[in-house]
Amino acid sequence: MPSNICKFFLTWWLIQQVTGLTGPLMLDTAPNAFDDQYEGCVNKMEEKAPLLLKEDFNKSEKLKVAWEEAKKRWNNIKPSMSYPKGFNDFHGTALVAYTGSIGVDFNRAVREFKENPGQFHYKAFHYYLTRALQLLSNGDCHSVYRGTKTRFHYTGAGSVRFGQFTSSSLSKTVAQSPEFFSDDGTLFIIKTCLGVYIKEFSFYPDQEEVLIPGYEVYQKVRTQGYNEIFLDSPKRKKSNYNCLYSSAGTRESCVSLFLVVLTSLLVQLLCLAEP
């Protein structure tokens, strides 16, 4: 009996871990993503984030290297840039770093956060990147394009969001270039009101990038043909977590994280109990 129970839960857990390996990906509300907006705890996070960043560096050499590379570029470009009050070197470095090699691994960790929160080594990076976009946002909306090599499917019902930070371009030509798009993929045509034009920060300014936070919600979704999806946002946000890594974390966020970790532990304990 313990063996059957173990197999059942282990199978269920593995299914939760594997997404998008075959067939199209579902375009939904990204329920597994880490989507903190840090509302009401910015001051506490500004104090705590440098310590969290050191902890993340100790657990991820890749992040440490990417951060140092981005820091050099930020120090070179910041004298010629203007940025809002409260925007500091941590915010600038995080934004530059995202456009480099760390972006793919970071977004994977953000998307899969709920599946393995104990292995999330981007606590400070997520905060600094989120805060950078919040500070730079001026309320302007942008019409942008995002090409992917993966096919996405929309059920036809309900609002959607990306969950992860999402790179897009003002240029349709860039979005449809072979580097980002294939005939088997999806072309997103997006109206974003929370996305920020970050060309000046990017390692690749020719990409004309607009970076969209994962918590932006699109209430108007329309498909066209077999590989085009139109998304329209009326400046709406949605987050399942808030201030999780500050002492001001909401009860709901802490309970949610506790349940995720508890589920993982139960699966492991059931398997260990097998004779």
From Swiss-Prot:
<dbReference type="Pfam" id="PF01129">
    <property type="entry name" value="ART"/>
</dbReference>
<keyword id="KW-0325">Glycoprotein</keyword>
<dbReference type="GO" id="GO:0106274">
    <property type="term" value="F:NAD+-protein-arginine ADP-ribosyltransferase activity"/>
</dbReference>
<comment type="similarity">
    <text>Belongs to the Arg-specific ADP-ribosyltransferase family.</text>
</comment>
<keyword id="KW-0472">Membrane</keyword>
<keyword id="KW-0328">Glycosyltransferase</keyword>
<dbReference type="InterPro" id="IPR050999">
    <property type="entry name" value="ADP-ribosyltransferase_ARG"/>
</dbReference>
<keyword id="KW-0548">Nucleotidyltransferase</keyword>
<feature type="signal peptide">
    <location>
        <begin position="1"/>
        <end position="20"/>
    </location>
</feature>
<dbReference type="GO" id="GO:0003950">
    <property type="term" value="F:NAD+ poly-ADP-ribosyltransferase activity"/>
</dbReference>
<feature type="binding site">
    <location>
        <position position="146"/>
    </location>
    <ligand>
        <name>NAD(+)</name>
    </ligand>
</feature>
<keyword id="KW-0521">NADP</keyword>
<keyword id="KW-0808">Transferase</keyword>
<feature type="active site">
    <location>
        <position position="167"/>
    </location>
</feature>
<feature type="disulfide bond">
    <location>
        <begin position="141"/>
        <end position="193"/>
    </location>
</feature>
<dbReference type="GO" id="GO:0016798">
    <property type="term" value="F:hydrolase activity, acting on glycosyl bonds"/>
</dbReference>
<dbReference type="GO" id="GO:0019677">
    <property type="term" value="P:NAD catabolic process"/>
</dbReference>
<keyword id="KW-0732">Signal</keyword>
<dbReference type="GO" id="GO:0003953">
    <property type="term" value="F:NAD+ nucleosidase activity"/>
</dbReference>
<feature type="active site">
    <location>
        <position position="209"/>
    </location>
</feature>
<dbReference type="GO" id="GO:0009897">
    <property type="term" value="C:external side of plasma membrane"/>
</dbReference>
<dbReference type="InterPro" id="IPR000768">
    <property type="entry name" value="ART"/>
</dbReference>
<feature type="domain" description="TR mART core">
    <location>
        <begin position="61"/>
        <end position="238"/>
    </location>
</feature>
<protein>
    <recommendedName>
        <fullName>T-cell ecto-ADP-ribosyltransferase 1</fullName>
        <ecNumber>2.4.2.31</ecNumber>
        <ecNumber>3.2.2.5</ecNumber>
    </recommendedName>
</protein>
<keyword id="KW-1003">Cell membrane</keyword>
<keyword id="KW-1015">Disulfide bond</keyword>
<feature type="binding site">
    <location>
        <position position="202"/>
    </location>
    <ligand>
        <name>NAD(+)</name>
    </ligand>
</feature>
<keyword id="KW-0520">NAD</keyword>
<feature type="binding site">
    <location>
        <position position="164"/>
    </location>
    <ligand>
        <name>NAD(+)</name>
    </ligand>
</feature>
<dbReference type="GO" id="GO:0016779">
    <property type="term" value="F:nucleotidyltransferase activity"/>
</dbReference>
<feature type="binding site">
    <location>
        <position position="98"/>
    </location>
    <ligand>
        <name>NAD(+)</name>
    </ligand>
</feature>
<feature type="disulfide bond">
    <location>
        <begin position="41"/>
        <end position="243"/>
    </location>
</feature>
<feature type="propeptide" description="Removed in mature form">
    <location>
        <begin position="247"/>
        <end position="275"/>
    </location>
</feature>
<feature type="glycosylation site" description="N-linked (GlcNAc...) asparagine">
    <location>
        <position position="58"/>
    </location>
</feature>
<keyword id="KW-0378">Hydrolase</keyword>
<feature type="active site">
    <location>
        <position position="146"/>
    </location>
</feature>
<feature type="lipid moiety-binding region" description="GPI-anchor amidated serine">
    <location>
        <position position="246"/>
    </location>
</feature>
<comment type="function">
    <text>Has NAD(+) glycohydrolase activity and extremely low ADP-ribosyltransferase activity.</text>
</comment>
<keyword id="KW-0449">Lipoprotein</keyword>
<keyword id="KW-0336">GPI-anchor</keyword>
